[in-house]
């Protein structure tokens, strides 16, 4: 596990312990029983691709550990509306407070403002967070293979699917991909960022693409900054993308999305 990921996971352990003092897991479980059915996250991506278009997971992210604050004028609801108008299939919302300046409320605000399915982008290591994600309104959760052992991957993905959510399983190298394939989640995200060096290369996706089973949907994540990047990945048969930084730095995030993915 990389140094930054080790720090984040250590913080998450403390965060979960603190949250348990205020809301028990039993209370979250009870709340889950009365919630409406999640919006289909994987289904939305697959429907877009079946229509012949690129499926974009547009990210709502105020800051990152490597780049600092990306967007000072940060209004999740307005960004969500902009993304939906720009052609996004789904949203990703950072809820990590300490490292990404996110907040649980950002997810709720974004989801309430549009009709798109929403990924809770956080560092999920415990069943408590899966129930919490469902209560917040998440339609999908992220599981980072580098942060979890095989038993955790199976248990957390199984719980999310049982609660009606989808799971995006994120990998950074071939060893992690082989582990991700062993669980039944339909979405595999290949992160082009090296967690040790923070260097980004689209070659990560291009090299590993052929190893992803045909019954899984590959999502390329990180380092997609221009329409040329999109064209390069599309030419290689990549049809689903998670993009955040490029949009967050734009004056109009949804227009940036449209220009990058839908104007040739």
Curated annotation (Swiss-Prot):
Keywords: Amino-acid biosynthesis, Aromatic amino acid biosynthesis, Decarboxylase, Lyase, Tryptophan biosynthesis. Gene3D superfamilies: Aldolase class I. The keyword Lyase applies. It catalyses: 1-(2-carboxyphenylamino)-1-deoxy-D-ribulose 5-phosphate + H(+) = (1S,2R)-1-C-(indol-3-yl)glycerol 3-phosphate + CO2 + H2O. Its EC number is 4.1.1.48. The lineage of its organism: Bacteria, Pseudomonadati, Pseudomonadota, Gammaproteobacteria, Lysobacterales. This is Indole-3-glycerol phosphate synthase. The keyword Transcription does not apply. GO terms for biological process: L-tryptophan biosynthetic process.
